[in-house]
Curated annotation (Swiss-Prot):
Compartment annotation: Cytoplasm
Positions bearing Blocked amino end (Ser): 2
Similarity comment text for this entry: Belongs to the actin-binding proteins ADF family.
Domain ADF-H as annotated: residue spans: 3-134
InterPro entries: ADF-H, ADF-H/Gelsolin-like_dom_sf, ADF/Cofilin
Protein name as it appears in the record: Actophorin
GO molecular function terms listed in the Swiss-Prot or TrEMBL record: actin binding
Function, as annotated: Forms a one to one complex with monomeric actin. Can regulate the pool available for polymerization. Severs actin filaments in a dose-dependent manner.
PROSITE patterns: ADF_H (PS51263)
Any single GO BP term: actin filament depolymerization
Length: 138
């Protein structure tokens, strides 16, 4: 949907995660009037993947960025992962709005390395996200 803005705070928190590793994750939502994407939660640098998942509502959509760390060939890697959480139980209008605004927020958050679209808990499990993050690592 055109006309939905992305707040400057969203870009700032993303850059703090990407450049300064000040946050482990950031979740974003539509504001009350559905005119702007705003920051909802910020997880500190020691937050876990479970902490992050606990911030996602069961019956509504969200965008999120997670600084995913994993081991490959004895070395640690990070992948900045964009997640569109659109659970099956979310209202149709919400799913349509989040899906159609996804490209707008991704254009503002420069440096996303992995994208995950999840409609249920299995698609957002740590194993599923880990598999996606490791997919392009040589």
């Amino acid at each position: 949907m055109s006309g939905i803005a992305v707040s400057d705070d969203c870009v700032q928190k993303f850059n703090e995660l990407k450049l300064g590793h000040q946050h482990r994750y950031v979740t974003f939502k539509m504001n009350a009037s559905n005119t702007e994407v705003v920051v909802e939660h910020v997880g500190g640098p020691n937050a876990t993947y479970e902490d992050f998942k606990s911030q996602l509502p069961e019956r509504d959509c969200r965008y999120a960025i997670f600084d995913y760390e994993f081991q490959v060939d004895g070395g640690q890697r990070n992948k900045i992962t964009f997640i569109l959480w659109a659970p099956d139980s979310a209202p149709i209008k919400s799913k349509m709005m989040y899906t159609s605004t996804k490209d707008s927020i991704k254009k503002k958050l420069v440096g996303i390395q992995v994208e995950v679209q999840a409609t249920d808990a299995a698609e957002i499990s740590e194993d599923a996200v880990s598999e996606r993050a490791k997919k392009d690592v040589k």
